[in-house]
């Protein structure tokens, strides 16, 4: 509250709380839902970037080019998971014109949840390698998990694929 928050989220009833709070079933799910709603209200284009390797470098290059013409917000560092993506979305302001969002996963279903928040206009897949095989099985599993991003690609959106295999 000292940082200026109007309320906090809690998964339990806070007896004798001297600050406003919202009781939720899951704090993480609530944060993701709020981020999804907030980004939809801003109605700015989103570039969603995923892949086995090269996500951060690709994000940096794309954001560098876009910032020459547009006020661009990009994922800081590799805040690319189910908590990091919403935290990035919360940094967006009305004056931002485009968001470049990195999305990293290690299991099936994660990309669907990230893409639901981002709803990208452009999807970039850097490559499909052999990362996270412990949960995804093989390269085909990685491909299946990464391409979950397409479930929430905006109508008339664009897809950029790398033809380089690792």
Task: State each model region's role.
Residues 164-166:
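Conserved small/polar residues in nucleotide/adenosyl-binding loops
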């Amino acid at each position: 509250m000292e940082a200026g928050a109007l309320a906090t989220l809690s998964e339990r009833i806070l007896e004798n709380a001297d600050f406003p709070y919202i009781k939720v079933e899951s704090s993480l799910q609530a944060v993701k839902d709020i981020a999804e709603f907030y980004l939809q209200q801003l109605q700015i284009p989103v570039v969603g970037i995923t892949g086995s390797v090269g996500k951060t470098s690709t994000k940096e290059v794309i954001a560098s080019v876009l910032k020459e013409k547009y006020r661009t917000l990009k994922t800081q560092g590799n805040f690319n998971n189910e908590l990091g993506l919403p935290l990035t979305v919360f940094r967006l302001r009305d004056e931002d014109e485009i968001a470049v969002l990195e999305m990293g996963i290690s299991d099936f279903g994660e990309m669907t949840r990230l893409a639901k928040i981002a709803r990208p206009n452009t999807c970039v897949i850097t490559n499909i390698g052999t990362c996270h095989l412990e949960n995804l099985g093989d390269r085909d599993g990685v491909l299946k998990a990464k391409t979950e991003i397409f479930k929430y690609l905006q109508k008339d959106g664009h897809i950029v694929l790398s033809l380089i295999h690792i």
